[in-house]
């Protein structure tokens, strides 16, 4: 039975699959549209399972306010092209809406959207992963997104503009803690041991080495804490000094960046082509 272009078009619109996949599915079912859809759904799930081994290190960070809190969500894909795709973003925003409605756990979000995720993987041909969801409580909240890849929410006692600027600062400067005294004792101890060893290797007298370590530790805790950093809007002041002048306070922040901690697989072009050829021979 000859398959018409109209049939292929209809199947593409109903499944979102590629033209050649649609044509092949219709040929295998002698033009039976519903059977072709069923078969593609089955094979799509199989394709999704194969894609699960691929590294999803691209994607988007989304932010939404709930009742007295905000939610930050990271959903990953494999390429920046898919990260801008309407189907991918629609899926990510659907997950975000559910999270913002009632602080749903990551495990429950994954379970609730697994069927939709598998269907999306089959449709776009990339691994998709709902990777992280973070909630931050506060009555005064300000958020900032830098493109699609970085999202920040800051809460505290300050006007909206101040908190917004501080969220921009957090996006750019990547502090890990609010205040120097918030740096965990084990982090401080590890850095202090390192600085002592460095000072000893430099051959400094004990008294001078001790002062050097104190100074270096102050610099270390300042650089990784928000209030100890130089404020990007007024670099001659620390964020702490700026907040004191404003009579303001930051109580918490969360910063997420797409792909943090994911080791992205690097392949040269020749290897990539060879892999595609090998895959086509197996198909």
From Swiss-Prot:
Q: Which Pfam families match?
A: EF_TS
Give a GO molecular function annotation for the protein: translation elongation factor activity
Location(s) in or outside the cell: Cytoplasm
Keywords in alphabetical order? Cytoplasm, Elongation factor, Protein biosynthesis
Superkingdom of origin organism: Bacteria
Please give an example of a GO cellular component term from this record. Answer: cytoplasm
The answer, when asked if Membrane is one of the entry's keywords, is no
Q: Which InterPro entries match?
A: EF-Ts_dimer_sf (IPR036402), Transl_elong_EFTs/EF1B (IPR001816), Transl_elong_EFTs/EF1B_dimer (IPR014039), Transl_elong_Ts_CS (IPR018101), UBA-like_sf (IPR009060)
Q: CDD domains given for it?
A: UBA_EF-Ts
Q: Which SUPFAM superfamilies match?
A: Elongation factor Ts (EF-Ts), dimerisation domain, UBA-like
Does the keyword Protein biosynthesis feature in the UniProt annotation? yes
Residue segments, region Involved in Mg(2+) ion dislocation from EF-Tu: 79-82
Into which family does the record put it?
Belongs to the EF-Ts family.
- What does the UniProt record say this protein does? Associates with the EF-Tu.GDP complex and induces the exchange of GDP to GTP. It remains bound to the aminoacyl-tRNA.EF-Tu.GTP complex up to the GTP hydrolysis stage on the ribosome.
Give the protein name, as stated in the record.
Elongation factor Ts
């Amino acid at each position: 039975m000859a398959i018409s272009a109209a049939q292929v078009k209809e199947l593409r619109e109903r499944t979102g699959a590629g033209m050649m996949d649609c044509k092949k599915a219709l040929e295998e079912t002698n033009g039976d549209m519903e059977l072709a859809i069923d078969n593609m759904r089955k094979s799509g799930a199989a394709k999704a399972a194969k894609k699960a081994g691929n590294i999803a290190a691209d994607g988007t960070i989304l932010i939404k306010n709930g009742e007295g809190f905000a939610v930050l969500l990271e959903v990953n894909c494999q390429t920046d092209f898919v990260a801008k795709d309407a189907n991918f973003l629609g899926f990510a925003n659907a997950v975000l809406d559910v999270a913002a409605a009632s602080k749903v756990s990551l495990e429950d979000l994954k379970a609730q959207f697994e069927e939709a995720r598998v269907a999306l993987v089959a449709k776009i041909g990339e691994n998709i992963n709902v990777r992280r969801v973070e909630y931050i409580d506060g009555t005064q909240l300000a958020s900032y997104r830098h493109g699609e890849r970085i999202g920040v929410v800051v809460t505290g006692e300050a006007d909206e503009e101040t908190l917004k600027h501080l969220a921009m600062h957090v996006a750019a400067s990547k502090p890990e803690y609010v205040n120097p005294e918030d740096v965990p004792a084990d982090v401080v101890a590890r850095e202090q041991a390192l600085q002592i060893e460095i000072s000893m290797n430099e051959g400094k007298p004990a008294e001078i080495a001790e002062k050097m370590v104190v100074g270096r530790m102050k610099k270390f805790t300042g650089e990784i804490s928000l209030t100890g950093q130089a404020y990007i809007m007024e670099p001659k002041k620390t964020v702490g000094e700026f907040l004191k002048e404003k009579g303001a306070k930051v109580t918490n922040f969360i910063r997420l960046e797409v792909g943090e901690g994911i080791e992205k697989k690097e392949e040269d072009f020749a290897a990539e082509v060879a892999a595609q050829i090998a895959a086509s021979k197996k198909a």
